[in-house]
Amino acid sequence: MKDKILLYHKNCPDGYGSRWCFERKWGDEMSYIPVAHGAPPPEGLEDKDIWIADFSYPRDILLVLKEKNRSITVIDHHKTAEDTLKDLDFCHFDMSHCGAILSWYYCNGLNKEPPLLLKYIEDQDLWKWQMPFAKEILAVIDSYDYSFRLWEELNYRLQDDQKFSEFLAEGSALLRQREKKIKEIYAKKHTLTVFGEEIPAVNSPLYQSELAARVAEEAGTKYGLAYYFDGDGYVFSIRCGKEKDFDVSAVAVKFGGGGHKAASGFKVKNLKDLNECKVEIPAAERKNHQHD
């Protein structure tokens, strides 16, 4: 393990996009370690310079890391983390950008325009879908492994007009395949009881964002769920439905998770835990949540 360490959000385009920015700047001078949300810090983090991108540890863990290491810098954009860490001077939050864009600015300065690759990542991560041909482009990006060489290739293709057209054609084919699979999975939708309320859900490790959003929108509920069993518990993605003002992160945080207003996640040991909070909340608030 090298003296410079980047810890970044594992199995996430935004997290890997953050790594890509740091690796372009520091190359082999830095160790790059993917970290799953909720997992403890890797062993051996002492006397290091540490950067944490696209996620945050709980406050107590961050303070221990700060005490044991030369420096620590957190670059994050998750609302639920900012609520508890914003007073720490080594934590930097900006809800208007994704982790990869924030990492780009950190590594390159605010005056250097982020590449299209990262702008598309942000469009998906913040659940905006405002970039042209976003679904086609992101279908291609999502089909590639997390590899520095492959992401350099993706970045190059998006900047070349001819290759961009090829990108769109490839994305259209991938979208057809994805939509077919999503329809097959969606047909198995059901409901789960969350704090006494029936919430539409789909059991799938694939296309969780799309499925959670779709079940909510078609059922007309405040939010929808997509989940899968990872061998240790049930991992949930939660997306807002037609009520765009509803803050799904408020639900996720009650199970020890977090995220954004429109897109969040959490994990429970058993499905019956969906009626039990991991964090203490006032009884009146729980009652209000059941009936609002």
Place the predicted regions along the sequence by residue.
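N-terminal small/polar loop signature for handling phosphorylated ligands or for N-terminal nucleophile
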Residues: 5, 19, 23-25, 29-72, ...
